[in-house]
């Protein structure tokens, strides 16, 4: 069981969300080009804080603080995608200004930049996905369906240095990228292969050998993906699958190593003309005691929970009534973070599911932090050419906490 303990209002539409790998920190990228980083309270701070002052959250009786660590207008266009480095020290952002910027996660100070190669006509080839594969390798996908590999050890130059490799795994832009865990024989422990979705196909690319394969046409746009291991192994199955979210509300399961075609389908959202798009996927931490489970953020604003093995939806909650969910994940403390529209919500296990008092937390206003990077003024709402499945802006978000329970699992 989860309840929402905090709602963070944003100054513009959310285009990207990233969660720190080892600290309770989240970063957001906005349509205006702003990047903002928040620190969430730890479990210990939540339990012992006596601070009852007003906060930016909608939590009625929350304790503790959500602090704005820094805020800046990082890109002159929109900020399309964000990712933390492997160790969490760096935050990489990419925008429609044709730049990737590497900044210190703690302070927001930019330490390196990458110029994205332009399109054939000389225009900006805007980014769609950025992912730090290892401390040395950054993956960057663009609107033109290119997938660039950069060596992070190369310093910034005003003369655009070419990427170390460029691949084209799909005919359409890369909509999601999921690294595959390193093999047991790996000496570095870092991923060397990854799965991408783009258009109606899935592809697997190797760091050294390039694109290894591309699936058959799935006759449906593939939107999101995630990896889950530790499933029941039987026959040729190793218990490792990549789960892919489609534009019509269907999850498809792909056995690792058998990439030609999907082997299972799960209907998450049904509708007369097809279900809502599954915009983002994440694995629910097993520490929460719910078994193997996937959380899916939908274009309708709902978050649905799918129990693997049962292969069915066991519960759902609502992030927003009008805006779709484009960011979803869990921080190191077990908080679920959902983002979409102009709000980010932070959730935790409800009191009756963990046998303790209800915990909550609030935060400080983000309006007092000065921008620290490329600009110190608020621009008008940035426009973006990305083919995004966006809905009209929501109007009233002043709602109380929502509660979600897992049917037959408590």
Swiss-Prot record:
UniProt protein name: WD repeat-containing protein jip5
Subcellular location(s) per record: Nucleus, Nucleolus
Domain of life: Eukaryota
Classification via InterPro entries: WD40/YVTN_repeat-like_dom_sf, WD40_repeat_dom_sf, WDR55_POC1
The UniProt record lists the keyword DNA repair: no
Feature: compositional bias, Acidic residues: 43-53, 364-376
Renumbered residue ranges of the record's region Disordered: 41-65, 354-410
Similarity annotation: Belongs to the WD repeat WDR55 family.
WD repeats: 9-48, 74-113, 119-160, 223-264, 273-316, 320-357
Keyword Nucleus attributed: yes
Record's GO cellular component terms: nucleolus
Segments of skewed composition (Basic and acidic residues): 377-386
Keywords recorded for this protein, A-Z: Nucleus, Repeat, WD repeat
